[in-house]
Amino acid sequence: MLNKMKIESQLAQIGSIKEPVTGAVSYPIYQATAFRHPKLGQSTGFDYSRSKSPTRSVLEEAAAQLEAGDAAFACSSGMAALQTVFTLFSHGDHLIVSLDLYGGTYRLLERIMTRFGVTASYVDTNDLDAMSERLQPNTKAILVETPTNPLMMITDLELVSSWAKDRGLLTIVDNTLLTPFFQRPIELGADIVVHSATKYLGGHNDVLAGLIIAKGEQLCAELAFLHNSIGAVLGPQDSFLLMRGMKTLALRMERHEYNATAIANYLLEHEAVEEVYYPALRNHPGHSIQNKQSSGNTGIFSFRLKDARYVEPILRHIKLIAFAESLGGVESLMTYPAVQTHADIPEEIRRAIGVDDRLLRLSVGIEHVDDLIADLEQALTAAKQELQ
């Protein structure tokens, strides 16, 4: 029944009808690692919690439904989810990856996966000619972030998924920034979706989690084997917290988008700001593609200051907005990508994509937008006065 309802109803009802014994509206935390067998050769469906646990199973069922996949796998972090997906590949395999990429993903690919002989080429995934140039006989998959972090570049998922499918490649999409509330990559042709569920899905900066959602029986079976064998699974407490956060995802994403759009437009007109990178703005190069494949916009964007000397005093003077290294929570956070989230990416790549010493990233929370703008205004004013 739930899968026929609107996504708002699906989210609010996660786990609420899954506990038949007591009728608990909130699905309980099964803090157990082992489960009794009725008799030899029989199982309740749960044996050992690394392989499967009741609380995590309810979360995974909900995630698969929301992302239109056949199965989902909850991991101990977003990086654990990516690591599990990357172990689909073997020594000698090659991946094509979005050029503008989260620094942690780049670090995992370049400093860990290369040890096992898996290599990657980084390319603008909107440029099919450039991707074709990087295509190798041993290429197995394409990994896409859309929007990218932090420059908010948009990739046409239908186009890229079709291109990949024609060449026998898997399409993996990081959907962290939009969530299934605004974008469902599997419906657009992707094979695998990954999330840092720590971010918008959890939404409260209090749970570390990752999700993998996949389509196709064979692919799901292989991921289930890897998920169990690697063992970077999500525990019952964190599974419960993630489900609790997801129940309010619709309300939060709508407020994130509303606030971010208002603040992006405010900064666009500010004398200290050179450029704002946010797909909701009409001048954004990916605006039309974003509107075609997504029903809304994320709550995160980046902006470039005219003078790098503004950065330090702005970060020192913000009060309501926290200078902290994450995104997607109800609290607003500001980050300096060049020295934080993207510090592991070589400087020449950072500069090529625009992650320089003038770029700040703002994860807009659900506070009142007037208070957030007032905080930015006073910080920008204070920074200007210090530089005079």
What is the role of each PLM region?
Residues 119, 133, 137, 252, ...:
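PLP-dependent enzyme catalytic core of the Aspartate aminotransferase-like
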Residues 34-83, 87-88, 104-111:
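Conserved N-terminal alpha-helix of the aminotransferase class I/II PLP-enzyme fold
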Residues 68, 138, 272-275, 320, ...:
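Glycine-centered tight turns that cap/initiate beta-strands
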Residues 261-325, 345-351:
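Conserved small-domain helix->loop->beta segment predominantly found in fold-type I
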Residues 1-46, 388:
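N-terminal glycine-rich, Lys/His-bearing helix-loop that initiates the first secondary-structure elements
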Residues 2, 13, 72-272:
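Conserved PLP-enzyme active-site core in the AAT-like
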Residues 29, 37-58, 333-358:
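Glycine-rich phosphate/pyrophosphate-binding loop
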Residues 242-251, 298-306, 361-365:
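Short, well-ordered beta-strand elements within core beta-sheets of diverse protein domains
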